[in-house]
Structure formats: structure tokens, C-alpha cells
Amino acid sequence: MARLAPGISDAFVRDHPQVAELLAEWPAERIRQELDAVLKLWDVLDLTTAIDWHWYARLRTSAGRAVFVDMMIELNPLLLARHPDQVRPVLIHEAAHLVVQRLHGPQNPHGRVWKHYMKVAGESSKATHNLDVSGLRRKKVRRRRRRSGLSKLVKALQRRK
């Protein structure tokens, strides 16, 4: 399966043509440049090789996510294709989480230290987005609970009484 960008296959773009426009506006090199620029601004250039990113189509309503164990930023291609102007703010938001975790240890996720990094980067320190997520939520599948053989027997015995 050919990859157009980290985490994105040709087949995914065929199924979601709006993502092709996002990838044209935000190629991997541009995202890496933005990430490196903010790390330089924060004076943590030593983390440029530690922090990586990719598109992650399993995200539904989250614009992005920071994975601490892997020092990885995951970006939602479907949501950000609708709002390409939000790629940079989301990238910086998630990068700030990774930097805070690496340099300061466990902290309040959107606490004072994280807000400081966001302010230095010139981005909003708002923790959540209000982007249109219509059609992106998973459809809930209602499943009937299977009853074990024992519970069926108990029900049958109760009916006999």
C-alpha cells in the first residue's frame, strides 16, 4: 500500500478526496518545518529528533493527540481537511504536551506550564476545539447481551415457580 504522507495511503485519499487538498496544503515537509520552528522557539531543539508526527485516521472528533510513550503527535486528517487553518495550532498544542511531559514530568495536561508554552508560541491556550465534527462520530452499535447457559436455566426455573 503506497503512502502519500505519514499514516495516509493512496486508498484512503481515494475514499476521502478532501484529504488530498489537505495534503497539498500541508505536505509532510511543511508540518516538520512548523514543528521544528516551534521547538526552536521553545529552545528545545534537542527534541527535534525525539518528537515525530503522523496522520491518524482512527481519530474521530479529536483534532490531534500526543502519545507520550512514543513522543508522537497524531493528527486527524478528516477533521483537519475540513479546517486546514487549524493544522498549525493543533500541531503546536500537541507538541506542547510532549515537551511539558519530557521536560517537567507529569503535569496538569492544560495547566500553567502547558499554557506558558502555548503563549510563547502565540497560540490559544484553550484546551478544546469547537470544530464541526458532524458525520465523524462512530455510529453506536447496540448489542444484545448474550446470556450464558446458566442464566437461561435460572430464568426457566423462575418461570416454573
What does each model-identified segment do?
Residues M1-P89, L98-K161:
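Active-site-proximal or metal-binding-adjacent scaffold patches in catalytic folds
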Residues E94:
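Walker B catalytic acidic pair
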